[in-house]
């Protein structure tokens, strides 16, 4: 009988949820749910100096915001806990002591200065830097001498000589390493805290993880973890290493690159929809059959096949993300779009926090104009700018429109029509434009474009009668007057 699939997402609380980490979590989530398996969250917090306040909370909060849930973890418990590595130190201690007793690991008393000197010497000789094994076979006398000096040892794993480590990667197919390319590596630091490779191998075994899906940058860790598995006689899980995410210059996405928004929290703050972010991330290095790109979470779960994980780097296309979010925005009701947009108008100082019912209705109508056009909530500030200014600047294309011979006649006639209106309703504005057409004989672009540019400052935009009605008679007449003088 085949084991139930068990996968894990194991973030370090060294920062907030990054798009790359979110993708790792999402692919593990889809892999588990597709196969009726278990999805586990484990917090790898042993690098205490790098942990940041709120890092763990951010990871969990924004995974939930994206629509993911998990079967075991720090917040939901489970039979394989604890799920936070700093709470598992006794487990690691028992196991590394076992390796020491079986001479599969040993204490290394070399100082940081000695290790650095060794490394520099290797580089100077054109060699690949790796631990040369200086303390691999210390005598009792040497050990006593180092301890008398007050040296605190780290513990190194004794890498087997002349051994091949080969595995069939779920993404890359067959991958091979040779043990002679590795020096004996540290499994317990001088402060008694286990290193990443030791703790991960122990946790993955004890938590009965069947598949390890992670980023390509972890592939060199795999043979070290395989060595630890073999040292304990444990079954080795299946590995899959997802390709890197690259920017439009085809360079690895760097957290320091501020030209790209990279943290899930930021997308939420900008008024993106979690379903759209989920959809976009699911296609970063994985592709469905066919050309369709917009799918629900349930559809992704149903069709997720690890065999379709890409072997090529995944391109992070910001414009595509905007397009995708727009697809989801168009499906939302107006209440949701207002909820995503209004806080940004408040933040920009366009409207106050405490609006009257009349003001609320007006703002709602303004937002409704851009419902189908909007890519994300914060975009409303730029899109709706013309409604919050007394005067508008005419773009170059608009200035050309206003040079037309018919423009003064059209605008004067339209101003007269507006003056006569009792209520600025879209239907009344539309009728006023038709009346100008009948009066002046101008139609099509010669009619609509001067009115649009003079009143909105733009050559393109929302339905013109609706926009003019919301701008209000006084503002529109002032703008027309400024054009015709």
From Swiss-Prot:
Q: Which reaction does it catalyse?
A: tRNA(Glu) + L-glutamate + ATP = L-glutamyl-tRNA(Glu) + AMP + diphosphate
- Per UniProt, where does ATP bind? 255
The residue numbers the entry assigns to motif 'HIGH' region are: 11-21
Function comment = Catalyzes the attachment of glutamate to tRNA(Glu) in a two-step reaction: glutamate is first activated by ATP to form Glu-AMP and then transferred to the acceptor end of tRNA(Glu).
Q: Which family does it belong to?
A: Belongs to the class-I aminoacyl-tRNA synthetase family. Glutamate--tRNA ligase type 1 subfamily.
Name this polypeptide is given: Glutamate--tRNA ligase
User: InterPro entries of this UniProt entry?
Assistant: aa-tRNA-synth_I_cd-bd, aa-tRNA-synth_I_codon-bd_sub2, aa-tRNA-synth_I_CS, aa_tRNA-synth_I_cd-bd_sf, Glu-tRNA-ligase_bac/mito, Glu/Gln-tRNA-synth, Glu/Gln-tRNA-synth_Ib_cat-dom, GluQ/Sye
Name the GO terms of the biological process aspect.
glutamyl-tRNA aminoacylation
Naturally occurring in which organism (per UniProt): Bacillus mycoides (strain KBAB4)
Q: Which GO terms describe its cellular component?
A: cytosol
Subunit structure, as described in the record = Monomer.
User: Keywords, A to Z?
Assistant: Aminoacyl-tRNA synthetase, ATP-binding, Cytoplasm, Ligase, Nucleotide-binding, Protein biosynthesis
Task: Motif 'KMSKS' region — list its residue ranges.
Answer: 252-256
GO MF terms held by the record: ATP binding; glutamate-tRNA ligase activity; tRNA binding; zinc ion binding
Q: What is its main location?
A: cytoplasm
Protein EC: 6.1.1.17
Stored SUPFAM superfamilies:
An anticodon-binding domain of class I aminoacyl-tRNA synthetases (SSF48163), Nucleotidylyl transferase (SSF52374)
Q: Spell out the subcellular localization from the entry.
A: Cytoplasm
């Amino acid at each position: 009988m085949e084991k139930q699939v068990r996968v894990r997402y194991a973030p370090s609380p060294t920062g907030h949820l990054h798009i790359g980490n979110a993708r790792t979590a999402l692919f593990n989530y889809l892999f588990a749910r597709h196969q009726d398996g278990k999805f586990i969250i484990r917090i790898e917090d042993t690098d205490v100096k790098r942990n940041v306040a709120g890092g763990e909370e951010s990871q969990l909060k924004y995974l939930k915001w994206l629509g993911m849930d998990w079967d075991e973890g720090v917040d939901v418990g489970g039979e394989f806990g604890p799920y936070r590595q700093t709470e598992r130190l006794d487990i690691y201690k028992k196991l590394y002591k076992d390796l020491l007793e079986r001479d599969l690991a040993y204490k290394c008393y070399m100082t940081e200065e000695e290790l650095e000197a060794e490394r520099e010497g290797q580089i100077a000789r054109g060699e690949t830097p790796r631990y040369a094994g200086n303390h691999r076979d210390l005598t009792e006398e040497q050990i006593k001498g180092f301890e008398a000096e007050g040296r605190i040892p780290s513990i190194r794993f004794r890498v087997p000589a002349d051994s091949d480590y080969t595995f069939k990667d779920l993404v890359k197919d067959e991958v091979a390493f040779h043990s002679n390319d590795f020096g004996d590596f540290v499994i317990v630091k001088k402060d008694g805290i286990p290193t990443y490779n030791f703790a991960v191998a122990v946790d993955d075994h004890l938590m009965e993880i069947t598949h390890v899906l992670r980023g390509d940058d972890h592939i060199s860790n795999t043979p070290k973890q395989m060595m630890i598995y073999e040292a304990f006689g444990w079954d080795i899980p299946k590995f899959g290493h997802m390709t890197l995410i690259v920017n439009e210059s085809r360079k690895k996405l760097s957290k320091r690159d501020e030209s790209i928004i990279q943290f899930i929290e930021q997308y939420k703050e900008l008024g993106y929809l979690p379903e759209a972010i989920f959809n976009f991330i699911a296609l970063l290095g994985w592709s469905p059959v066919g050309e369709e790109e917009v799918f629900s979470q349930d559809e992704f779960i149903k069709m997720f096949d690890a065999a379709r994980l890409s072997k090529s780097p995944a391109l992070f296309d910001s414009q595509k993300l905007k397009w995708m979010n727009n697809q989801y925005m168009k499906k939302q009701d107006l209440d949701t779009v207002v909820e995503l947009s209004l806080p940004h108008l408040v933040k920009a100082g366009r409207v106050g926090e405490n609006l009257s019912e009349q003001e609320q209705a007006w703002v709602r109508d303004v937002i409704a104009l851009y419902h189908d056009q909007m890519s994300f909530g914060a975009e409303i500030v730029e899109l709706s700018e013309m409604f919050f200014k007394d005067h508008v600047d005419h773009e170059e294309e608009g200035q050309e429109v206003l040079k037309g011979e018919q423009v003064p006649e059209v605008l004067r006639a339209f101003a007269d029509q507006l003056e006569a209106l009792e209520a600025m309703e879209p239907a009344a504005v539309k009728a006023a434009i038709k009346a100008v057409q009948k009066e002046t004989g101008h139609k099509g672009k010669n009619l609509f474009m001067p009115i649009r540019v003079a009143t909105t400052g733009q050559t393109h935009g929302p339905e013109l009668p609706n926009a003019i009605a919301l701008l209000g008679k006084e503002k529109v007449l002032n703008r027309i007057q400024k054009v015709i003088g």
